[in-house]
A protein has these predicted regions:
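Bacterial N-terminal signal peptides that target proteins for export
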Residues: 23-33
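Hydrophobic helical h-region of N-terminal Sec-dependent signal peptides
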Residues: 32-36, 40
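C-terminal motif of bacterial Sec signal peptides marking the signal peptidase cleavage site
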Residues: 41-45
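Bacterial signal peptide processing site
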Residues: 47-50
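Cys/His-rich zinc-coordinating "finger/knuckle" motifs
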Residues: 53
Length: 270
């Protein structure tokens, strides 16, 4: 299912190894269903000795993975809270900053450099890419707008300098044709905080419904200078034009490593 996944393992006896294998089978089975809904990327699971049930198979946070160097990284939980992974060193996604779904357990110990110390049970990157301008979209021929729905969900949110969207569209279902998704800025000269989500089926069939998850970096928008503004999102739905508003504040610090993250979603996106 995840041919490029990296799995961190502890030394264990044969009995524990069998138990962990059964646990991972359950996790992979459940995550297969989850990825067909959310189009997830590079899966990394961290084995432990506790079988705490199915709760740990579900994501309990959407984070930004921020590499510090090759040996360390931290996770931004929202605009204000940072997490230090106690059981991981270098980012499993390399030098790229990415958005990711994760399941973590908060530890009682204190972190010296961040707000919370956590144990990462598993983490899975999502497609992360920069927003583009109207001029860039036209120059690259990214003007097509096939119908799509934005799903009201806890992962559909503007935070930490990103707009993360769960969207719903029709797919052929054979994972052969990538759908193209982009966020375009500068669509309204009178409102620099209005952006447009564009979805291109790229000639894919329209046989089944499926959901995708994508995060767009918003560092090209004007600095809100610490204030919270309304970010307006527009898109072409199956019933006509729609829009939604999000609370948005420019990220206080900008780290290197922008650009498109190399991920391998279950539903193919670009």
């Amino acid at each position: 299912m995840f041919p490029h996944s990296a799995i961190l393992r502890k030394e264990t006896n044969k009995k524990q190894l069998s138990k962990n294998k059964n646990k991972m089978k359950k996790m992979k089975s459940l995550l297969w269903g989850l990825t067909t809904l959310l189009a997830l990327g590079g899966f990394v699971a961290c084995d432990d000795d506790n079988d705490d049930g199915y709760w740990s198979l579900y994501p309990n946070a959407l984070v930004t993975v921020k590499p510090v160097d090759s040996e360390s990284f931290y996770m931004q939980l929202n605009d204000d809270i940072t997490l230090e992974p106690a059981n991981m060193k270098g980012s499993p996604f390399g030098a790229k900053e990415v958005r990711a779904l994760t399941n973590y357990t908060r530890l009682q110990e204190k972190s010296e450099n961040y707000d919370q110390l956590v144990y990462v049970n598993w983490i899975d990157s999502i497609l992360t890419k920069p927003a583009i301008t109207v001029a860039e979209a036209e120059a690259e021929g990214l003007t097509r707008q096939d119908p799509v729905e934005i799903v009201r969900d806890w992962v559909t949110i503007a935070e930490d300098g990103y707009l993360t969207l769960r969207f719903r569209a029709k797919w052929e279902g054979d994972n052969r044709t990538p759908h193209l998704v982009n966020l375009v800025t500068g669509v309204n000269p009178e409102n620099p905080y209005e952006v447009q989500f564009r979805h291109d089926t790229n000639g894919d069939g329209q046989r089944i419904w499926g959901d995708g998850l994508v995060a767009f970096r918003l560092d090209g928008l004007p600095d809100t200078e610490g204030k919270t503004v309304k970010l307006k999102l527009t898109w072409k739905s199956f019933s006509g034009p729609k829009s939604a508003e999000f609370e948005y504040r420019t990220r206080e610090t900008t780290t290197e490593g922008g650009g498109t993250a190399e991920v391998r979603p279950a539903l193919i996106l670009q």
